Amino acid sequence: MHHHHPPYHLRRKSHNFLFTNLKMAAAAAASSAATVTASPTTASPACVSAATAGLPSAATSSTPVLSPTAAITAATAYCPSMLPTRKRPRRTYFTGDSSTGLGCSPAAHYLLYELPDEVLLTIFSYLYERDLCHVAQVCKRFYTIANDNELWKNLYQGLYEYDLPLFNPSPCKFDFVQPEECDYDNPWKESFKQLYHGVHVRENYHKHGGKETGRSVAYFETIQAAFDYCDDMERPLVLIHSGVYRTRLIIETNISLIGAAPGNVAENVILEEERESTVLFNEGAQQAYLGYVTIKFSPHSCNDTVQHHKHYALEIQENCAPTIEHCIIRSVSHLGAAVSVSGPGADPGIRHCEISDCENVGLIITDRAQGHYEDNEISRNALAGIWVKNYANPIMRRNHIHHGKDVGIFCFDGGQGYFEANDIHNNRIAGFEVKAQANPTVVRCEIHNGQTGGIYVHEHGMGQFIENKIHSNKYAGVWITSNSNPTIRRNEIYNGLQGGVYIFGDGRGLIEHNNIYGNALAGIQIRTNSDPIVRHNKIHDGQHGGIYVHEKGQGLIECNEVYANTLAGVWITTGSTPTLRRNRIHSGKQVGVYFYDNGHGLLEDNDIFNHLYSGVQIRTGSNPIIRRNKIWGGQNGGVLVYNGGLGLLEQNEIFDNAMAGVWIKTDSNPILRRNKIYDGREAGICIFNGVKGCWRRMKFSEMHKQVF
């Protein structure tokens, strides 16, 4: 592990001696004539009063902060040739009595003008922050050197240990920023100032139980001691340094706790508990903050987990709204969850956290709790990644939920929520499961590579699934069953290893404006008394049929475009009775609409064209109503009724087919009424032996004045 090693031992040994002498020389210089010393009005804005923070504010000075030794890593590496060219003032100076203010002593003049920058920088490196602020007021040269970036970087890393400047621009907001991306001339100094009011917790820090000599920094060995010290503070900040802290934290105030360590901060600062919830936020923690730590709940053994079904690594109760960021959260309990958010008024912000490798559910949100959950990694948990139940209503954005051993997100028992732009994949069951009156809104998520399916809505589940990408799932992209009634709108549902949308077991639902393509089975499958509304979808390029309605399936199917599928555009079979209106069904590699084995239903006002087989086929007891359709461009005829097919065909336009407009054969008995059959390359109607049927008021073109 990388650590920063500032010369604390040198500072403690030589601080008073160095600074006393430096102040004496500076005092002599400050009393010199105006021709020698800097103007007080130029240097004084560089410092903040010691009564406030003891630190300078670079933003209040218009003088640019230079870094004269940026290329020199230590004073021992000094070489005269490495120095920048610096114009020195004339060596003449007044020799009057310095006590009168009319002259400058040779020693003061040498200190101010002749002593090399590297030597001053080395001297300044032994000073603490408050003393640096003082010497920065002496003159412009001291101000420039005392604000050297490397000087403040070493000072900063010696106290806070971070590899990058950490900024606290507003309550509950802490961000690391690359120095070159900062707007500050000296980002290390600015970060130092923003964090300076913090209280430090460092294990085994025996020599610094209170304030450290020479600086206004408080150290404690336990988090509880730091809490006690901060009791009367407004918005206190506690910095927890590297170590394993086996303690329970109960937070009821607006305190900020943040890990402080080099490298990956959260991995080096660990909060762990074995008996009760490790971190508990209660009422009163409206603007509390916890960041950059690992939070673990580790019961002694598996036998103890029964008593821990309500214990968690992180627990947030009602009427509090803490912010938790950049934390690693683990639980090895086989019951409960790693994170629990429960109760009215529970409204946390959980961002950039990792909730992974837990032996239970990753995150439970329940009992009308809310909250914002953004940019988290939730993975490899033994049960669901997230549970939302009992009318909880969270907002979840840009989370990565993957490789769980159960479902990715499970909404049930009236759970709600808004889920946007989440990446949900490779979970053992569905990516998103909804049941029991749950009603989430899922927008612009990517739900893919599920080991069972993409979205599973069952047992009176609801929900709005809008503009998602649902693809590459092992089973159907969307499952709807058992009186569930979700809205599936403007999604891309593609490349499933089975079907696109599967509605069965009395499923309902509104399926509209989706792009469904490239699935191994039917783009939409409706069966067993299911009755959805399917409209304005594109269903194309499937390896099976476009829409498959069977086993007494129903549904209103309208205004869809179904094309370029490997098998029939629409299959209707086994007692099914859907209604198809105003669809465009075309360019299929087999039949356009295929009724067989007692398939029924209404086919009305559709365009059915350019199929390799017939536009419509009716067989084996099927008895549909086919009305006002345009059926044209078939490579094997317009309508084929055979093997005991029935049906009513009326007011259709059947034209430009390669073979007969209507074929009737093998014991079939359809009714044809007021159809227009024209421009075919064979007969208008072809009737074979054993055929019955009724047709009247038919209109044929000049080519079809005969019925064969």
Name every feature range the model reports, one short phrase each.
Residues K207, R215-F220, I255-H309:
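Right-handed parallel beta-helix/beta-spiral solenoid domain characteristic of secreted/periplasmic
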Residues M1-S125, H134, T144-E212:
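CRL adaptor-proximal regions
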Residues R248-I250, R275-T278, P299-T305, Y312, ...:
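Short glycine/acidic-rich loop motifs that flank beta-strands on beta-rich extracellular proteins
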Residues E203-I240:
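Acidic Gly/Asp/Thr-rich repetitive segments characteristic of extracellular carbohydrate-active
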Residues T294-Y391, I395, H400-H402:
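Right-handed parallel beta-helix
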